[in-house]
Amino acid sequence: MAELTPIIVIPARMQATRLPGKPLADIHGEPMIIHVWRRSVQAGLGPVVVACSEAEVFDAVHAHGGQAVMTDPDHPSGSDRVWEAVRKLDPEGRFDAIVNVQGDLPTLDPQIIRAVFAPLAEPGVDVATLVTEITNEEERTNPNVVKAVVGLRPGQRVGRALYFSRATVPANAGPHYHHIGLYAYRRDSLERFVSLPQGVLESREKLEQLRALENGMRIDCALVDTVPLGVDTPADLERARALLKA
């Protein structure tokens, strides 16, 4: 099978509820979105583009030498924004894999981006994502920590996702896995995904990835050792600034 040709797309929007203007939040003299863009470039997978809906984000990315594309401000999800950006940038289909990197991960290790792409080497995989083993008891029962049900044997680093939930699953003794919301898609799989109606379980759990499972799509999970810091609040922003302090 021919090797995939990926593009990295970073969806960014200014209307975050808990941290308005998040993409342009200053971290040591640069907007947060630039930190994410730079780390995505360092992953070395392919071109990197920011998918935004505000001119100020577009201008900031271009001012730092990056590429951005304007998208519809009313998309219901980041996946829809990513797909619009891909269609605009690459209508002829040169890129057959898309890596979706969240725009609020300024401390993201480029190796994590490479890790999420790797499972697509298996021909039957539609979507790839990441998990890490939960070691904190509070996280195990926290509904804001999404759990992935994946049967990883000892020493195994990639496994097939059977379900995602906010509940503590599976039952009984054994590891639980924290789902990390980075994704890599085959192009035709992303196109299909955004065309599907919202699923029953997706609506119930408020987890978009369940739409893929409800429609028979295969999601494989790569096991990584750390959870990247997502910046959702002013306190998170201060943590990111501290971590990135020169």
From Swiss-Prot:
InterPro entries: Cytidylyl_trans, KdsB, Nucleotide-diphossugar_trans. GO terms for cellular component: cytosol. It is found in: Cytoplasm. GO terms for molecular function: 3-deoxy-manno-octulosonate cytidylyltransferase activity. Gene3D superfamilies: Spore Coat Polysaccharide Biosynthesis Protein SpsA, Chain A (3.90.550.10). It catalyses: 3-deoxy-alpha-D-manno-oct-2-ulosonate + CTP = CMP-3-deoxy-beta-D-manno-octulosonate + diphosphate. Its EC number is 2.7.7.38. Pfam families: CTP_transf_3. It comes from the Bacteria. GO terms for biological process: CMP-keto-3-deoxy-D-manno-octulosonic acid biosynthetic process; lipopolysaccharide biosynthetic process. It is an enzyme of class 2 (transferase). Pathway: Nucleotide-sugar biosynthesis; CMP-3-deoxy-D-manno-octulosonate biosynthesis; CMP-3-deoxy-D-manno-octulosonate from 3-deoxy-D-manno-octulosonate and CTP: step 1/1; Bacterial outer membrane biogenesis; lipopolysaccharide biosynthesis. Keywords: Cytoplasm, Lipopolysaccharide biosynthesis, Nucleotidyltransferase, Transferase. Activates KDO (a required 8-carbon sugar) for incorporation into bacterial lipopolysaccharide in Gram-negative bacteria. Belongs to the KdsB family. This is 3-deoxy-manno-octulosonate cytidylyltransferase. It comes from Paramagnetospirillum magneticum (strain ATCC 700264 / AMB-1). The gene is kdsB.
